[in-house]
Amino acid sequence: GNCLELGEYCDGSKDDCQCCRDNAYCGCDIF
């Protein structure tokens, strides 16, 4: 998965969610 841009939401990909969490860029509901 790729890092998400500021304000974007995760699509359910664990990689994207982890990146999202690590960078505190967006909310992620699915892990």
UniProtKB/Swiss-Prot annotation:
Predominant place of localization: secreted
Cellular compartment(s): Secreted
GO CC annotation: extracellular region
Keywords: Calcium channel impairing toxin, Disulfide bond, Ion channel impairing toxin, Neurotoxin, Secreted, Toxin, Voltage-gated calcium channel impairing toxin
GO molecular function: calcium channel regulator activity; toxin activity
Post-translational modification as stated in the protein's UniProt record: Disulfide bonds are present.
Pfam families assigned to the protein according to its UniProt record, in alphabetical order: Toxin_34
Tissue distribution of the protein: Expressed by the venom gland.
Recorded family membership: Belongs to the neurotoxin 04 (omega-agtx) family. 03 (type II/III omega-agtx) subfamily.
Described purpose of this protein according to its UniProt entry: Omega-agatoxins are antagonists of voltage-gated calcium channels (Cav).
Name under which the protein is recorded: U14-ctenitoxin-Co1a
